[in-house]
């Protein structure tokens, strides 16, 4: 049984993420308990909404330290959408300090002719870490589902695992560092490709459990 703690911090509906994880064979547990994060085999941090309320909710529930400890200790971690953005230090969207786990900032798309903001709908990924386990078994340029006006800009470009292009702007769509992965798109809303990404994440968790 692969137990995955899905962090509840009142930032979006967690049902879709849980359903996706269940579909690929994991046992998700929605929780805001630091003890549950410690006991789980892996952690998923989803989220929809704005940067400042999100980090305030994380801190008011005393989840910042447990999240940082889990990542530092090598527990597999998947951030989704807002759950990617709040890992960064700052955001152009708000005033609060982010969790600061990934050096860098969150920036807003520039307005330009022919594009809409938010970037919403299906778009192609371009892999910059093509051999990463998260992408195993996917086509070279898979379509996934996005809804966002802001994107992450890591100081270390080597952390970028995939990019997406909106108009003339090519931005980070996923990051990977050790056992931390986080994506701007919604795998749970990305049909077959999204389920494959979730399955790859769960498979890596299971492999780790076998050797530990």
Swiss-Prot record:
Manganese among keywords: no
Residues annotated as the enzyme's active site: 81, 186, 188
Keyword check for Lyase: yes
EC number: 4.3.2.10, 3.5.1.2
Superkingdom of origin: Bacteria
Entry GO CC: cytoplasm
Subcellular location: Cytoplasm
Annotated keywords: Amino-acid biosynthesis, Cytoplasm, Glutamine amidotransferase, Histidine biosynthesis, Hydrolase, Lyase
PROSITE patterns (UniProt xref): GATASE_TYPE_1 (PS51273)
GO MF term set: glutaminase activity; imidazoleglycerol-phosphate synthase activity; lyase activity
GO biological process entries: L-histidine biosynthetic process
Ranges for domain Glutamine amidotransferase type-1: 3-211
Pathway the protein takes part in: Amino-acid biosynthesis; L-histidine biosynthesis; L-histidine from 5-phospho-alpha-D-ribose 1-diphosphate: step 5/9
Job of this protein: IGPS catalyzes the conversion of PRFAR and glutamine to IGP, AICAR and glutamate. The HisH subunit catalyzes the hydrolysis of glutamine to glutamate and ammonia as part of the synthesis of IGP and AICAR. The resulting ammonia molecule is channeled to the active site of HisF.
Assembly behavior: Heterodimer of HisH and HisF.
Protein name: Imidazole glycerol phosphate synthase subunit HisH
Species lineage: Bacteria, Bacillati, Cyanobacteriota, Cyanophyceae, Oscillatoriophycideae
Gene of this entry: hisH
């Amino acid at each position: 049984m692969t137990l995955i703690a899905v962090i509840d911090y009142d930032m979006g509906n967690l049902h879709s993420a849980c359903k996706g994880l269940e579909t690929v064979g994991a046992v998700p547990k929605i929780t805001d308990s630091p003890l549950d994060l410690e006991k789980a085999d892996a952690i998923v941090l989803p989220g929809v909404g704005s940067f400042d309320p999100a980090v305030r909710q994380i801190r008011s529930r005393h989840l910042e330290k447990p999240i940082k400890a889990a990542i530092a200790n090598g527990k597999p971690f998947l951030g989704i959408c807002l759950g990617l953005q709040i890992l960064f230090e700052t955001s152009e969207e708000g005033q609060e300090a982010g969790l600061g786990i990934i050096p860098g900032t969150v920036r807003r798309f520039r307005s330009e002719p022919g594009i809409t903001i938010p970037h919403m709908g299906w778009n192609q990924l371009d892999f910059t870490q093509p051999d990463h386990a998260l992408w195993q078994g996917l086509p070279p340029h898979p379509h996934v589902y996005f809804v966002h006006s802001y994107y992450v800009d890591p100081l270390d470009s080597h952390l970028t695992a995939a990019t997406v292009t909106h108009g003339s702007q090519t931005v980070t769509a996923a990051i990977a560092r050790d056992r931390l992965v986080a994506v701007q798109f919604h795998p749970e809303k990305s049909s077959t490709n999204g389920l494959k990404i979730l399955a790859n994440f769960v498979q890596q968790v299971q492999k780790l459990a076998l050797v530990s």
